[in-house]
Amino acid sequence: MRLSPVLLRLSRGPALLALALPLAVALAFSDETLDKVPKSEGYCSRILRVQGTRREGYTEFSLRVEGDPDFYKPGTSYRVTLSAAPPSYFRGFTLIALKENREGDKEEDHAGTFQIIDEEETQFMSNCPVAVTESTPRRRTRIQVFWIAPPAGTGCVILKASIVQKRIIYFQDEGSLTKKLCEQDSTFDGVTDKPILDCCACGTAKYRLTFYGNWSEKTHPKDYPRRANHWSAIIGGSHSKNYVLWEYGGYASEGVKQVAELGSPVKMEEEIRQQSDEVLTVIKAKAQWPAWQPLNVRAAPSAEFSVDRTRHLMSFLTMMGPSPDWNVGLSAEDLCTKECGWVQKVVQDLIPWDAGTDSGVTYESPNKPTIPQEKIRPLTSLDHPQSPFYDPEGGSITQVARVVIERIARKGEQCNIVPDNVDDIVADLAPEEKDEDDTPETCIYSNWSPWSACSSSTCDKGKRMRQRMLKAQLDLSVPCPDTQDFQPCMGPGCSDEDGSTCTMSEWITWSPCSISCGTGTRSRERYVKQFPEDGSVCTLPTEETEKCTVNEECSPSSCLTTEWGEWDECSATCGMGMKKRHRMVKMSPADGSMCKAETSQAEKCMMPECHTIPCLLSLWSEWSDCSVTCGKGMRTRQRMLKSLAELGDCNEELEQVEKCMLPECPIDCELTEWSQWSECNKSCGKGHMIRTRMIQMEPQFGGTPCPETVQRKKCRIRKCLRNPSIQNLRWREARESRRSEQLREESDGDQFPGCRMRPWTAWSECTKLCGGGIQERYMTVKKRFKSSQFTSCKDKKEIRACNVHPC
């Protein structure tokens, strides 16, 4: 019996031959007579031949290149997916890329190279390294690899896949298992015009657009704008072919210009709404500040929209900020299929394009209007040496974003009779039974349990269920969704495949032989990755043991040891760890030498995969008000720790502080207290007294200006005599002075009861030569009487104005 080529890789050594044979039996390849297969006569030609019955007319398997391009760009990486629509599956596969009209029997027939994404799922064929096959033959519904397009001049390439489903049933190459891509030859790099066909689909379809920004300092390090990087609000619509929002080779409208230069969607939305007959839904989603952060992946901005037969195209755009006029988006993406149905899913990687309205070449170039306006075009790596995307070798620009458009509902009578997949079969299930994850960030759940068995026991549509536990509800005002989830399924009667199949991990490397001389044993282990879907017990072995021989003819220097003891427990509870075991020397070497046999061993051990939950943080709050109302201060913002990491501490920053600067604080004028009133400037008749105060601080930065510093008030001593002689006047003044002094001395006891005062000192010098100064004099206590209870007995001070004339 010859093994299927899918299984031949298992027979690469005598140790694996024993595994390959029972596995072939398990897959039932030996249940029917196999046709003889001729030996390979050329390079990799054997991988295109499989024994058994070939099936045709299948639609459940598909080979898809991400974005569904018809052309490839030389040297560009493309994600290739081979999938089976539920409830179908496949066990084995081969995938190759051939130049058009080549058979694959020569090395030069193959085009491009594949890159492995998941080594547990896929590997290169050992005897045909240009082809990809499965790592382990088991039930699967999807695999993915990268394909690197060949150099320029290769021409058209055909990707071909072969599917082994079960027993000896296989599908190969034709129809949906073949994808033809031709070398890009377009005016615009990376842009190919697709003719827009009339749509024949019925009813309407509802889609969700999700935008994943990938523009970051890590992916695009050259001149990355750290402070103000962002994506503007998404704006677009679902529309007919009679309306164009934007397109390569066209001119930007005023709305597109304002999005491209200012990040403002207002004018663009106004333009879209003016085309009400041609537009079904306006698409809007929030802006992203900053352009990249983990939240952009966990809770990427999204928007829902609808399409119908006449308005089956969708377009949108968003600005890269800061930039001169650079955007990303889709133009006239057709969601109607040739089979009169609605596209299930679209995934597109996006590169930036220039709106043709500003001639800047760097992220933060000053405004430089393009006059006359140029056509919209994709940016290339050869545009300008100062461009952040410049590459002297002309390589492709790394994608800056990805958009995913998924169909989430269909309404009305549908005219595509043949369903796309099981989801289409049960498209009319109630909304609560849809498999949509709308879990708020404030709800922390455990991992989902495995899916239950399908509710239908025959080949008919049914439902299956899974459950999870609500661990924490961080915000009681936000309700948490149900802890049960339902998914459409087809009963087991649709396939004669055993539903009790369980998924196993790869075998861990064989342990060392149990003895150092002679015949012993060695073992290896694996673990169950997924238990059977029908809930039965997995009966596949998790440990294998085989004999091993080391130095059949043991020399006199050999020593005799006990069997190895049991392995210690694995040092890890999940993931990769270490375990040890020991043995003892039973008999030393006959020649008296030291026993060189190992007495302890350590090896890696694999526990079930770790499922860790990183610490969950809230969004940053808005910056607080500045700590001051003017001048220099500080402001802060915070975020909350919603959930600790399942393993380890959360070391993320919870508070940020930065300086803030407000206009300088106004400084008001500052003055001293008023001085005491001066003596009247006349000895008789009407006069005036003054008092003054000093400026201590001049006003600054709009502070209150200084008020008056000198005040006057009238005073009147007594009436002056009319026309007295000067001599008589002086005599009278002298007499009055003597009389006043006598009265003062006589009244000292009454004016200052309880103490005797010294006379007033002389007036001090004026503090200013002009403009109003002050003078001071003092009277001090000479003697206090012991029996005095008066509080007026204290030192005195008088102040008067002087030199009040202007300077």
From Swiss-Prot:
Residue ranges of every copy of the Spondin domain listed in the record: 195-388
Amino acids binding Ca(2+): D325, D354, D358
GO MF term list: LBD domain binding; metal ion binding
Compartment(s) of residence: Secreted, Extracellular space, Extracellular matrix
Xref: InterPro entries: Reeler_dom, Reeler_sf, Spondin/Thrombospondin_T1, Spondin_N, Spondin_N_sf, TSP1_rpt, TSP1_rpt_sf, TSP1_spondin_dom
Positions of disulphide bridges: C44-C128, C156-C182, C199-C336, C200-C340, C202-C415, C443-C480, C454-C489, C459-C494, C502-C538, C513-C517, C548-C554, C559-C595, C570-C574, C605-C610, C615-C650, C626-C630, C660-C665
Signal peptide: 1-28
Positions of the Reelin domain: 29-194
Domain TSP type-1: 442-495, 501-555, 558-611, 614-666, 668-721, 754-806
Reported function: Cell adhesion protein that promotes the attachment of spinal cord and sensory neuron cells and the outgrowth of neurites in vitro. May contribute to the growth and guidance of axons in both the spinal cord and the PNS. Major factor for vascular smooth muscle cell.
PANTHER family per the UniProt record, alphabetical: SPONDIN (PTHR11311), SPONDIN-1 (PTHR11311:SF16)
Descriptive protein name: Spondin-1
Biological source species: Bos taurus
